[in-house]
Design a protein with these regions (language model features):
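Rossmann-like S-adenosyl-L-methionine
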Residues: 2-7, 18, 219-474, 482-483
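Short, acidic/hydrophobic/Gly-rich beta-strand patch recurrent on exposed beta strands
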Residues: 22-27, 146-149, 213-215, 344
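Extended interfacial segments that mediate partner engagement and assembly in macromolecular machines
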Residues: 60-72, 78-186, 206, 221
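Flexible loop/N-cap segments at domain edges
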Residues: 199
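Structural signature of eukaryotic scaffold interfaces centered on beta-propeller domains
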Residues: 202-204
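DNA-recognition alpha helix
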Residues: 481-493, 503-509
Length: 516
């Protein structure tokens, strides 16, 4: 029987979905997704939408709180939509993230692979090195920083975001006070009037340097010299102040024109010892300390040897590959964003002549570049993949297989697409050895993962005797199917074999390939 809008059910939350919502089931077995709940909560849930096979609800009354529920320490955690898990104990959050990675690999990848416990972030709060505050007005009409409420462009004032270092919140508030004191108006989307759209701040986790970028609808910022003088006197760690111009009616934060009011126009920092320069357009991991943990796992999985060639696809600013360059003979990086490739080359140069000489970076689509490199006969020993959320396309994965690396290290920001891609690679002679979830975004639904895939080698894997009698094959002309072989090996040896591996064994022993 369909659930009705505003119907109230008493349900127990069983787990968290991959978007951070609690999952319960109605008496008829229909899944109900409820944000702001914790596994173990017993609550009255009000249905807001029934989609047939599943429904969405909201928390009406919490009857019995979960042992994993904690007090929310931010007044706008719900409305702002940023910290979807702020009500959950951090240990429970890590368990939920690990379980979601396991679920993705089983449900989407069809893979029962070892998924390790999620690696916690060194900092649970105040961990972000970048913030983009939309500028609006508070209830008194004064300029304020905040965040957009979920699925809207309504700004929720937030003077102290718990995910940002306190100094970045302080700078945002100081700028808004200056704007209010001097009549500098926030931009209003509805009317198209006003000047200041966003305050974009970066802070080097190791250097402490701060970049201030004020996004405006036009280049001229009133009293800019006075603003710079006051701001740098109050916050001496500010290394540069910029104005970015974005006059368009768009959701995109930054425009294409940037003017430097003071400093070099960038800040400097390091990531796993790689020196980086960061401007407004730089793509950079927002949790430096956790990213260094992730890169350490990637290097451990790569197991590079001194004579190895490392190929870093989707290399960005080159930081993953450059963090491993001292362990291998040479590095090739590929990235489609020209500014990122320029940064990668500059980062390599700052690491010294030896690193620069052994590192090459190319601006190209990862799939096309990988296909060309494979066609040219390139055979890297290890390939690192760090694709966007959509994962890799089949052309890229096919090129990876053609280049035949002994190891593939896959860094993922979306376990679902990582599981899909791992499933495809397993059909082509690679085995997913293990998956390490890494929490780069505490208090939010997001989780990263590092996968290790190794190339199967018919000469190095154990031999398994398969009896035709055990497979119930009686006719002399019959052959065991691939599925029968896979099932037999799993039932008797708890080993997984791919179609390519079976074909390699058949070819080695002269077994003719037919319909099986």
């Amino acid at each position: 029987m369909p659930l009705q809008k505003n119907q109230v059910l008493t349900l127990t939350i069983e787990r968290l979905s991959n978007d951070g919502s609690g999952v319960a089931h109605s008496p008829d077995g229909e899944a109900v997704f409820v944000p702001g709940t914790a596994p173990g909560d017993e609550a009255d849930i009000r249905i807001v939408k029934d989609c047939g096979r599943y429904a969405f609800g909201i928390l009406d009354t919490l009857r019995t709180p979960s042992p994993d529920r904690i007090p929310v320490d931010c007044a706008v955690a719900g409305p702002c939509g940023g910290c979807s898990l702020r009500h959950l104990d951090y240990a429970a959050e890590l368990r939920a993230k690990q379980e979601n990675v396991v679920d993705a690999f089983r449900r989407i990848g069809g893979l029962d692979v070892p998924v390790l416990d999620a690696l916690p972030s060194p900092e649970v709060d105040r961990y972000r090195n970048k913030v983009q505050f939309p500028v609006g007005r508070d209830k008194n009409g004064a300029p304020c920083i905040g965040f957009y409420a979920g699925r809207t462009h309504r700004i929720v004032p937030c003077p102290d975001c718990k995910l940002q270092p306190g100094i970045l919140n302080d700078i945002g508030n100081a700028l808004c006070s200056f704007f209010g004191a001097h009549g500098i108006q926030p931009y209003d989307e509805a009317s198209g009037k006003g000047l200041v759209r966003h305050i974009f701040l970066r802070r080097g986790a190791h250097s402490g340097q701060i970049m201030v970028c004020i996004v405006c609808t036009r280049a001229k910022l009133p009293r800019s010299a006075e603003l710079v003088e006051q701001l740098t006197a109050q916050f001496p760690d500010i290394a540069t102040v910029l104005v970015n111009v974005n006059p368009r009616n768009t959701n995109v934060i930054l425009g294409t024109e940037t003017h430097t009011l003071c400093g070099p126009g960038f800040i400097e920092d390091t990531l796993c010892g790689v020196p980086v320069r960061l401007g407004p357009l730089s793509f950079y991991q927002v949790n430096t300390l956790a990213a260094e943990q992730l890169y350490g796992i990637a290097a451990e999985y790569a197991q590079l040897q001194p004579d190895d060639l490392l190929l870093d696809l989707y290399c960005g600013m080159g930081t993953i590959g450059l963090s491993m360059v001292d362990r291998c003979r040479s590095l090739i990086g590929v990235e489609i964003v020209p500014e990122a490739i320029d940064s990668a080359k500059a980062n390599a140069a700052r690491m010294g002549e030896s690193v620069a000489a052994r590192s090459r970076f190319f601006c190209a689509d990862a799939g096309k570049a990988a296909s060309q490199l494979a066609a040219e006969g390139l055979h890297p020993d290890v390939i690192v993949l760090d694709p966007p959320r959509k994962g890799c396309d089949e052309a890229t994965l096919s090129a990876v297989v053609a280049m035949s690396p002994r190891r593939v290290v896959y860094v993922s920001c979306n376990p679902s697409t990582a599981a899909r891609d791992a499933k495809w690679l397993e059909t082509q002679g690679y085995r997913t050895e293990k998956v390490q979830p890494v929490d780069l975004f505490p208090r939010t639904k997001h989780v990263e993962a590092v996968l290790l895939l190794t190339k199967l080698n018919v000469e190095r894997h154990i031999e398994v005797d398969v009896s035709m009698d055990e497979l119930n094959v009686t006719a002399a002309e019959s052959k065991a199917t691939y599925n029968e072989i896979r099932d037999y090996v799993w039932d008797h040896h708890q080993l997984k074999v791919s179609n390519l591996y079976i074909a390699q064994v058949k070819q080695k022993y002269g077994i003719i390939e037919r319909e099986n």
